[in-house]
């Protein structure tokens, strides 16, 4: 969504106007760019049926992303499976979007309630993420609940954030 700007000028010396200059222009190229400010969520140790989330646990920081481009962006979120004993999507692995700055995105269509994490792309979770400096970032909170049949091992998941205009 690049923009072409055209202009021309003419001078005034208080007695009259001169001729218009030739038309000049410049192009403002669109930049679609997101920075990950916090890219790691660590829940520590959780036992069987244990649960944790980044909104209730004050010492666990959520993902934080910022639009540092110059156009609004849509963000799709998906991840690899966190648990071995359950398929995705499930209530055992969820996310929700939260504004860090008021007016950062379209509240009517953004996933601000707990939503089951999926392992396929295609569902936009953040709509119209603003690019202006005072309202351009958001948190992605994560909630996990250890399934009853889950074996005790180290768990991890890769969360992917895809952007588009």
Language-model region placement:
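Sequence-pattern detector for short linear motifs
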Residues: 11-13, 101
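Extracellular fibronectin type III
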Residues: 14-28
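Signature of Gram-negative chaperone-usher
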Residues: 29-165
